Amino acid sequence: MHDENTRASVRARRPAPAARVRAAAVSVAAVSALLLGACASDTDPIDIFGHAGWQGGLADAHNSASVTTNGSRELSLDWMRPLGAPTATRPSIGPDGQVTVTSTGDVGCALGSFQGATGRKRFCNSLGPSGISSTAVADTASNLYAGDDGSMSSINPNGQLRWRTPVYGVPRTPQFLPDGNVLVMTQFGQTNVLSNQTGVAVAPILDLVPPPLPLDLPNAELRPANDGLLTCLVGGPDCAVAASPAVDPSSSTVYVVLWRAGAIAPQLVALTYTGGDTPSLEEAWSSPLLPSSVTSSPVLSPDGSRVYLTDVEGTVRAYSTEDGTPIWSYFVGDRAAGSVAVSPDGIIVPAGGAGSRLQAIRDAGDRPESLWKRDDLVQQGSPALAGGSTGYTVTGNDELSLVTFDLTTGETVDTDAMPGSTGYSPGVVVGPEGEVVVPTALGALYSFR
């Protein structure tokens, strides 16, 4: 199960994814946890928020795609390795530097964990074929939380299964709630709150899109777990929840883009989480219908007063977290539909893809303010932001490069080649020691220090 990649000696720099099940059966399964291979040594709470790694797909509860760790401006290629299969999402990085990637690998190797210092494979685990659609999230003990077809699982740092819980659908990238419980939403809108230690449901299931009830429709069948996942890529009613929610720990509020049954467009929805002995979730408000489909995650401003959405047309829109009122919009262009990155001081960098140029804006209250734009740099993936006013993104055509830029001015401060890379990157991530890790969609991993 272990192997070693050949550590790159090159330190080059150059500019440049059907079972038929009746509703009665799944309604029982959805409220019971299938506890398998419990390998945790204790049941003490885990300080979920106690590390500086890249916790999940978009780094943190706010989905900010930023870290406070000071970003290096003098990077060199440290190692590179093939994944053996395509990947569609960013990796996560745990507090020990462990890099975890989901891919379309064979049945036994769709969840890969790699040593941050060397790129050596630590373990490879099985996931269902839809596991590639989300990122495995890391906690402060380097436990992982990964979703696949009809289940949510937790794996310890050695690759052993801690617990596995059935859900209805395929989980989007999970989030942690303020008390450390795991928030699991599927593309069908089923919302679960699970204990991070045992996987047991600690709150009633909230179905944002109610499934068919046996008494109302006795012959109705539930949808296969992976139904509608392709729709999540483009936006449509078959995918109620296309991407991971954002969580504001300070107000215990969850924000999600939801396409309700029968609606002609999605809405931004806020859920209030109540912890304690009897945790629960309930809807607080919903915005007006959105002007266009949204397939990326909502992102919170640093002070929690705004939610930023990017629609499939390439427009960034700001909404009030008080009641979902639309505030302003900014057209990025070129159908760049990924989530924005937001620095701790509020600078917003839109995602790349589809030919969008690297640029930055600021939320000026009732309007967006353009800070700078690089017409010469077309992003081939989503950026990451770090402390010290430093940002990273992927550019290039025939071969990709990692570009380090000054967040305040947009100026390039470093360019590092990614030898042999083509296509695009799901996005850049930054580790606890300032290491920068870049996956490519075709299945390679590059680490810079």
Language model region names:
Residues 4-28:
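Bacterial N-terminal signal peptides that target proteins for export
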